[in-house]
Design a protein with these regions (language model features):
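Cleavable N-terminal export/targeting peptides
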Residues: 1-39, 253-259
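Short glycine/proline- and aromatic-enriched beta-strand/turn motifs that initiate or cap beta-hairpins
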Residues: 29-77, 174-176
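Gram-negative (and chloroplast) outer-membrane scaffold detector with strong preference
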Residues: 31-32, 80-181, 252
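Residues that define the transmembrane beta-barrel architecture of outer-membrane proteins
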Residues: 41, 66-72, 135-141, 159-161, ...
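Membrane-spanning beta-strand positions in outer-membrane beta-barrel proteins
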Residues: 44, 85, 162-164, 199, ...
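Residues on the lipid-exposed face of transmembrane beta-strands in outer-membrane beta-barrel proteins
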Residues: 47-51, 74-78, 143-149, 167-171, ...
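Extracellular loop and loop/strand-boundary signature of outer-membrane beta-barrel proteins
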Residues: 57-62, 127-134, 182-190, 228-236
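Predominantly the C-terminal beta-signal and adjacent terminal strand-loop region
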Residues: 86-87, 95-121, 129, 207-259
Length: 259
């Protein structure tokens, strides 16, 4: 999994570098139309919902099964032209993560003091990793820049479709409670941790009407600071989210969009 994290981090860095190259062209193609406005300027708001997967000491792809998470939120932004838009968003979600195969095979235990042990501890409550899951609640608050790649080409600049790469930066809160898999009993209560989250999404959207836009997205967010799952950090250095979902946007009535 560490190799996967390094690979994904490298890809994110390459994507950000590519966007830094493309960004000046987005302003260059912002051709001024009627009354100084571009053909696709304006404010918009929307809702989004997705399925996040967490990768930390524990993982959504655990030894027992794949745990499906959920997340939902609101966003609002401004579209400057057919290429470039920026938005703010707020989202809440929950996930369950469980031990990976390697930790189960090594028979790791979690003590009630929050320390990893390689066997049960006499005189202290302890639990096998194989019997535990981490229930993570999270909030994400931040900003995103969208670069519509189709807008770079004259033939597709005014298409109903868009294909966007979207670097983002978030303030992320996580709170992880450790529970048993068998009966969902809470064995350790977590505290709230703050993280800086950064990454990028790939989005595909379609303008249904002059007001409504439907889209899908998939992206990665790497988290700084403490592990999101509340487990002791050992061997696994991963701490990132992979989320895919749908978006429904509404162009506000005082904006200027082409028919």
């Amino acid at each position: 999994m560490n190799d996967m994290a390094n690979y994904l981090t490298t890809k994110i860095r390459l994507l950000v570098a590519m966007l830094a190259f493309i960004l000046p062209f987005s302003f260059a193609k912002a051709e001024v139309k009627e009354d100084g406005k571009t053909i696709s300027q304006g404010w918009y708001v929307g809702i989004e919902g997705g399925m996040p997967f967490g990768f930390s000491t524990f993982s959504s792809f655990g030894h027992d099964k794949t745990h499906l998470g959920w997340a939902a939120g609101l966003y609002g932004g401004y579209r400057f032209n057919s290429i470039f838009s920026a938005e703010l968003s707020a989202k809440y979600g929950e996930m369950n993560l469980s031990a990976q195969d390697c930790c189960v095979e090594r028979n790791y235990w979690l003590g009630s003091d929050g320390v990893l042990y390689k066997a049960g501890v006499l005189g202290m409550d302890s639990w096998e990793y194989a019997n535990l899951k981490s229930h993570v609640r999270m909030g994400q608050y931040g900003a995103r820049v969208n670069i519509n790649l189709l807008g770079l080409f004259h033939q597709t600049a005014n298409s109903r479709w868009d294909l966007a790469v979207s670097p983002h930066i978030y303030a992320v809160t996580t709170k992880a409670d450790i529970r048993t898999i068998a009966d969902d009993a809470k064995v350790m209560k977590g505290s709230t941790n703050w993280h800086l989250g950064y990454g990028a999404d790939l989005q595909v959207g379609y303008q249904l009407t002059s007001c409504l836009k439907l889209g899908i997205y998939s992206g990665l967010t790497r988290l700084t600071g403490e592990h999101m799952d509340g487990m002791p950090e050992y061997q696994h250095k991963n701490n990132f989210l992979w989320e895919s979902g749908i978006r429904l946007g509404i162009n506000l009535p005082f904006t200027n969009h082409h028919p």
